[in-house]
């Protein structure tokens, strides 16, 4: 039998995690040892949103994680990410092997630490600490699409997460905006749907000329959304208004 699992509710209560089959959580070391080494890891460092952490504590936690990473990661692709600004800066300061991304709600939720409250502040954190990029809640990007250009001009990568990323059209719009990647739940479904939107349109014609002169079955035409620069600019102005409601 594995150890009993506990879960923490949003109001801070600790409850037993009741499931059909109980098992213990694997350690980071076990994940490195048992998962295909070709599978990349996003090692997210999670901290309590409402605690102000001392730097010594953050250093101890991060050094313990880095010890496991450097011992067992081998050639596995890895990025680090965290919502905690000081932790993000320390991860980068303590190692330069793996990219570090700063997670942000992009202003969709307000925190005591102002560095967490906007994409503009996220850029400042990244530039201050030499981080590689930002991972934003997708609504934060749609509410402030102008920030994408500023982020790219700062030579930072931009990824997004959030429920809207399970909508193919929302992901396709981000492709048009120049966003570098998305975190999704429905990986295969979204990948296939967006691929169909991105790939060039195809016309399937009959070998004979019946489809050309109107006789017989018409050729099948697969289309993708087409936007002029003016239309795209209009959509980018409209999206923030839609997201507010």
Give the ranges of each region predicted by the language model:
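Metal-dependent phosphodiesterase/phospholipase catalytic core, i.e.
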Residues: 1-111, 121, 129-142, 154, ...
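C-terminal active-site rim and adjoining tail of enzyme catalytic domains
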Residues: 101-245
């Amino acid at each position: 039998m594995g150890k009993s699992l506990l879960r923490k509710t949003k109001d801070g209560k600790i409850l037993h995690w009741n499931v059909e089959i109980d098992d213990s959580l694997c350690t980071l070391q076990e994940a490195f040892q048992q998962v295909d080494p070709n599978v990349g890891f996003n090692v997210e460092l999670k901290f309590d949103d409402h605690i102000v952490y001392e730097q010594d504590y953050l250093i101890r936690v991060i050094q313990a994680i880095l010890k496991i990473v450097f011992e067992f990661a081998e050639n596995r692709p890895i990025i680090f990410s965290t919502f905690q600004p000081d932790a993000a800066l320390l991860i980068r300061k303590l190692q330069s092997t793996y990219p570090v991304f700063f997670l942000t709600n992009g202003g969709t939720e307000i925190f005591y630490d102002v560095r967490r409250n906007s994409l503009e502040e996220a850029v400042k954190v990244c530039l201050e600490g030499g981080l590689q990029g930002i991972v934003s809640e997708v609504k934060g990007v749609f509410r402030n699409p102008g920030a994408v250009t500023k982020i790219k001009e700062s030579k930072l990568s931009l990824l997004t997460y959030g429920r809207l990323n399970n909508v193919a059209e929302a992901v396709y719009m981000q492709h048009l905006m120049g966003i570098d990647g998305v975190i999704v739940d429905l990986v295969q479904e979204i990948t296939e749907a967006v691929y169909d939107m991105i790939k060039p349109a195809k016309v399937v014609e009959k070998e004979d000329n019946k489809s050309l002169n109107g006789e017989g079955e018409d050729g099948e035409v697969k289309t993708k959304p087409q936007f002029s620069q003016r239309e795209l600019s209009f959509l980018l102005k409209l999206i923030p208004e839609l997201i507010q409601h």
